[in-house]
């Protein structure tokens, strides 16, 4: 239970933003296990509660984990809108922190996302953490792949990255030896956060992203959900359905698995896995599988080709050509 103190500290910091006597007071309210505050009496980032929730996983999107309220305050999510927005100048930030509990071990998982008014590198960088902590972070991700514009990790339990105006951290708070943690699971969660950042309607990267057009039989599909993550195109599995792919979903509290079938060939993927099972054996994936709005997002080319679908790309246009 005491591991929840990390979230309690976050709540305390949020509380410190309450203006002193004589200034407009911070607005604060609770709803559905969320503690929400808004300091934007003078300035605002223009982000809503829904905008912040869109940057993290839903309460039931991580198999094997449950979004339980903190036993000390009844909250599982803390959202702070427009931090420092009660002052006319200085930094401006909105944040969301959400915690989950592992159903089997009781270990805690926390995802923190912070959105700034300027490129996040002006406020947070690897160097800040390198000199400001007794534990030296290691530059890069667990897999060696480039998550965001800059990333680093601590042991196997924490991954930090920044992208555009956003900083995100995924942290495991273990009740056992940290060496037993799965760093690639932590990283898979982070890739799902980067996907959400890139898809966010408020353009948190500071510029408009070039859309990827997916064509099946010369007709566009999956508009707005097909993007590149560090050079690898990913998309929800449903984008393959127009190519005569049949999807079968098995989702429980502890597992989220989808089987895709086409002409006797099949692919089976699980949420947060780095490999897929096929009718020809297991295949390592270039990017992990992760959930988004009720679907699983996968590396498009690898899955399509395993189902006998040819993939051709020219610029920002990708064509699926069923064989």
Language-model segments: which ranges?
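Hydrophobic h-region of N-terminal signal peptides that target proteins for export
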Residues: 11-21
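Short, Gly/Ser/Thr-enriched beta-strand-loop segments that form substrate-interacting elements
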Residues: 140-156
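Short, solvent-exposed coil/turn segments at beta-strand boundaries
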Residues: 146, 161-167, 230-232, 293-295
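Short, well-ordered beta-strand elements
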Residues: 165-178
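Bacterial N-terminal signal peptides that target proteins for export
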Residues: 1-7
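Primary recognition of N-terminal secretory signal peptides and signal-anchoring hydrophobic helices
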Residues: 199-323
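N-terminal "mature-domain start" segment
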Residues: 22-105, 134-145, 175-204
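A short acidic-to-branched-hydrophobic micro-motif
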Residues: 90-128
């Amino acid at each position: 239970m005491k591991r929840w103190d990390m979230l309690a500290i976050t709540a305390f910091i949020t509380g410190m933003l309450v203006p002193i006597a004589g200034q407009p007071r911070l607005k604060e309210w609770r709803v559905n296990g969320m503690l929400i505050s808004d300091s934007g009496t003078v300035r605002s980032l223009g982000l809503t509660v829904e905008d912040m929730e869109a940057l993290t996983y839903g309460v039931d999107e991580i198999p094997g984990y449950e979004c339980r309220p903190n036993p000390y305050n009844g909250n599982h999510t803390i959202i702070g809108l427009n931090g420092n927005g009660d002052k006319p100048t200085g930094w401006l930030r909105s944040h969301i922190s959400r915690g989950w509990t592992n159903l089997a071990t009781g270990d805690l998982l926390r995802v923190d996302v912070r959105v700034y008014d300027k490129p996040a590198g002006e406020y947070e960088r690897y160097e800040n953490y390198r000199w400001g902590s007794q534990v030296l972070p290691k530059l890069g991700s667990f897999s060696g792949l480039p998550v965001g514009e800059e990333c680093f990790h601590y042991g196997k339990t924490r991954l930090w990255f920044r992208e555009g105006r956003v900083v995100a951290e995924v942290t495991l708070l273990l009740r056992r030896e940290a060496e037993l943690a799965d760093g690639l699971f932590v990283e898979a969660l982070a890739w799902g956060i980067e996907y959400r950042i890139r898809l966010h309607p408020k353009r948190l990267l500071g510029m408009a992203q070039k859309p990827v057009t997916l064509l099946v039989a010369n007709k566009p599909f999956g508009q707005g959900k097909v993007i590149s993550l560090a050079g690898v195109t990913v998309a929800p599995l449903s984008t393959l359905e127009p190519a005569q792919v049949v999807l079968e979903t098995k989702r429980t509290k502890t597992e989220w698995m989808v089987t895709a079938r086409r002409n006797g060939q099949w692919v089976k993927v699980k949420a947060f896995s780095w490999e897929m099972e096929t009718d020809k054996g297991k295949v390592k994936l270039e990017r992990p599988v992760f959930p988004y709005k009720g679907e699983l997002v996968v590396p498009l080319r690898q899955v399509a080709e395993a189902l006998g679908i040819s993939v051709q790309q020219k610029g920002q246009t990708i064509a699926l050509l069923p064989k």
